[in-house]
Swiss-Prot record:
Belongs to the universal ribosomal protein uL4 family. This is Large ribosomal subunit protein uL4. Residues 60-71 have a biased composition (Basic residues). Keywords: Ribonucleoprotein, Ribosomal protein, RNA-binding, rRNA-binding. GO terms for cellular component: ribonucleoprotein complex; ribosome. The keyword Ribosomal protein applies. One of the primary rRNA binding proteins, this protein initially binds near the 5'-end of the 23S rRNA. It is important during the early stages of 50S assembly. It makes multiple contacts with different domains of the 23S rRNA in the assembled 50S subunit and ribosome. InterPro entries: Ribosomal_uL4 (IPR002136), Ribosomal_uL4-like (IPR013005), Ribosomal_uL4_dom_sf (IPR023574). Part of the 50S ribosomal subunit. It comes from Bacillus cereus (strain ATCC 14579 / DSM 31 / CCUG 7414 / JCM 2152 / NBRC 15305 / NCIMB 9373 / NCTC 2599 / NRRL B-3711).
Amino acid sequence: MPKVTVYNQTGSQVGEIELAEAIFGIEPNEAVLFEAVMMQRASLRQGTHKVKTRSEVRGGGRKPWRQKGTGRARQGSIRSPQWRGGGTVFGPTPRSYAYKLPKKVRRLAIKSALATKVVENNIVVLEDLVLNAPKTKDMLAVLKGLTVEKKALIVTADANESVELSARNIPGVTVITADGVNVLDVLHHDKLIMTKAAVEKVEEVLA
């Protein structure tokens, strides 16, 4: 079982915690991580692209000239696809790009992402994270005590408004709950900061 040092909010070591081998100790599966990231990014796409077909563009109801006798090519509408200003054939239409991987694959991807942070030594476990009032200064002090200088993902067991508001104005810092742990957020941030309660909750869900 991987062992990780537990810190308090000031950055002092207060003990150790054994992380679940089946979650944090597995060998990361890069192929599954790739698939999970692609799935999440696909679901973030707006998909609002749209062009007009010949039935939607304005005009073109009348035949521009008679069928025979002009010497020109026959035309039925000035909004046919070959005309300037005509409709588009097989153009993009609004659609959802979202799709889902099998549940087992999604769970393996989250485990692999968490295990990656352990392998890289980029996981920090906090005994607890309590802020009496939403103050950015207090959150910066916590991060400074933990010597976190890059992008950090903070995972709490439950929603904590003071923590969320305190981190909101700090570039590169994101706060989520244990229920919302996902592959894209874990891999996108350099450091993963979890409270002990959040670790227990994640292990309970993914066990």
